[in-house]
Amino acid sequence: MIRAKHISNLSSTARSFFLNGSRTSVTDGNSCVYSDDENCVSKRQQLRKEAGQTEKRPSSILPKPSVVGCILPGEVTKPVVPKKVDDFGRPSLLPQHVSSSPALPLKSHSVNYASTVVREEVEGKASSEPIGDQIFKAGIVAVNFLSDLSNCKIPSYDGGSDAFGLPKSCMVDPTRPISSVKSSNVKAIRREHFAKIYPRSAAKESSVGTTRNPSSNFRGAKEAERTGFVKGFRQVSNSVVGKSLPTTNNTYGKRTSVLQRPHIDSNRFVPSGFSNSSVEMMKGPSGTALTSRQYCNSGHIVENVSSVLRRFRWGPAAEEALQNLGLRIDAYQANQVLKQMNDYGNALGFFYWLKRQPGFKHDGHTYTTMVGNLGRAKQFGAINKLLDEMVRDGCQPNTVTYNRLIHSYGRANYLNEAMNVFNQMQEAGCKPDRVTYCTLIDIHAKAGFLDIAMDMYQRMQAGGLSPDTFTYSVIINCLGKAGHLPAAHKLFCEMVDQGCTPNLVTYNIMMDLHAKARNYQNALKLYRDMQNAGFEPDKVTYSIVMEVLGHCGYLEEAEAVFTEMQQKNWIPDEPVYGLLVDLWGKAGNVEKAWQWYQAMLHAGLRPNVPTCNSLLSTFLRVNKIAEAYELLQNMLALGLRPSLQTYTLLLSCCTDGRSKLDMGFCGQLMASTGHPAHMFLLKMPAAGPDGENVRNHANNFLDLMHSEDRESKRGLVDAVVDFLHKSGQKEEAGSVWEVAAQKNVFPDALREKSCSYWLINLHVMSEGTAVTALSRTLAWFRKQMLASGTCPSRIDIVTGWGRRSRVTGTSMVRQAVEELLNIFGSPFFTESGNSGCFVGSGEPLNRWLLQSHVERMHLL
């Protein structure tokens, strides 16, 4: 699945919204959605730029589809011979130092295309002075200029002076428009101006087209014929390699090298008296423009202070080290230091230390940055105290401050508090901006409240804020994730018609939505449209394509995409390796999943929890309990804290245990995680006469898990209810389900399509959960009919293929639901051509719902 970490560069509220899969959590790092923040550039992307100054990093993995188990060709680097799964031990799971491999040779046919961007135009006659004399004079002027700089004598130039006395022919004519120079959001150079730079080698072509391994679970009959999707992908892939811009080892000028959010003019949102940070950066404490030496000193101070705060935890030692620096810090420098701090305790200590320094006074920027730091740590009590101090110091919160508060409450799933801040900012006279509305739209859509999200979209337009590319991307993702893909696609087309150009993030969102809906041809078409629009794939794009190929059964082609990604100078990170571990694991190929995990370690990467979860799921799927235990122990040894998904995997394995021994072993694994969910199950009380004690117990636990993302909570509740149902605790299962439904953990489980026309959606549930959910929902209908006399005109029960369906064409959920409905003689039937949907309507449905046994169906 696509994971949140793949696109963390834009925003944790608005850009990371399309990577929330079942293997990741939504919580991530710093947010940069605010109007006065700098553009976000990830650390990984900065490393890519630094790597560009040296030779290319060797490919750590070049898969050969025809040979299972050999994933590193000898001519590139030393082959990695992974241990068999049965033989691995704890040390092999830990990251080890791997010696660097020989660098790949530089491409000899790299193209210098600088002349195509800026052309020198000589007007009049060229200088008759010998070129040697010109160079000599220019050198003398340069030496004098550098001497002035060293003595802090900054020369000033008027419009007609030439700093170095260079001939005018070497400059671009300022009166002439330069068509080849465009903004960063527009493709600067047409592809057809260049020859093919990276022709696909014969070896690579043969690797993609090699006969597939018959042992793969995805092959079978599909091996005899290839769909148009794979052929189309090869065609697009070749066109990418053939038509891409020249890429050298020291050039990273590609459009997608650094992804940044759309620029928002912060001046529009800053009230009088609250200086803009971009303007303040060039001014000293007195408001005068900084000289060159002052500006350099400012950066020097920020670096020195940050270095001290990185070395010490806040305390007397840190204070003494700061005093020994003997530096005078102003509010701007303090703000820059606070932005670099991740530990809220250190940041808060430094903040109050500054407040005690003679002559120092915090401004609105430092207060706002500190609010953001506390918000990431969910320290809302400290935030309220800080806001009171901010007002007492004469700094009124502005739009950016309120946006940070809304984002902080939203990422912690405190939606009511976020809306309260939204109302308070308007009462205080701060007008919401696009960031405000987009944040509210995103957090409500992620929590399953699509109606509120769309209402905020309407309010944004009514407030005179027309949607831009950023806004459209948020809304499109919200609609798609809520199951309204046609509406999302319609909005995408509307966006283009309105002259709002989609960016790479928008294309990635649309491709991901179509891929999740198994519309692989549409995903491929969007991939082609994206390239025709001048965008090159980034790591997120490549991951989506790999996932699409993997789910279609073409895992070797997915590995070929991995190789192509490396050739385009994208360095694979943990989520990319984790995706391939996950794809091979779901295919049932434990050996290949293990090989990719080992390849990640040999690439010098440290495993993360989602990747370990993928490998853990692989072991559990084939009943390798001992290997799963070893992996879990190594996770703990690495300091990786098992997540909610980790516990969910173990609980599902325990539910499906083939023997009491397996179930006991899984129970030990669950206990070793130390997750609060285990104590929740151990302390589950026996249901009382009305089940209120179980509901209170479940309610307290879900409150504890409040800040977890909805997908993780949904997965755990599904596993818990399924476990309780299959272990005979059906009354408890029903009570837990009712609490989860009240807390909107399953927002799509029950929906009114139109007046008195209801839809019960069970297709994302396990069979035990589906039976419990259906029984309690039908009992709710009966209760409503008896209380108000309102009767449903039609009820559709959608089972689909079901969460636990292993083989195409069969659904355990459908079978369990059909059996339950038949036992109680229900009037539900399946319409022709749609065996996954049971329909009940009219008077027969109402008479059946009023029967007393409907109230106790879940106890069967």
From Swiss-Prot:
Keywords: Repeat
Intervals holding PPR repeats: 363-397, 398-432, 433-467, 468-502, 503-537, 538-572, 573-607, 608-642
InterPro entries in alphabetical order: Pentatricopeptide_rpt, Smr_dom, Smr_dom_sf, TPR-like_helical_dom_sf
Domain of life: Eukaryota
Domain Smr: 760-843
Pfam family, one: PPR_2
Family: Belongs to the PPR family. P subfamily.
NCBIfam families: PPR (TIGR00756)
Name of the protein in question: Pentatricopeptide repeat-containing protein At1g18900
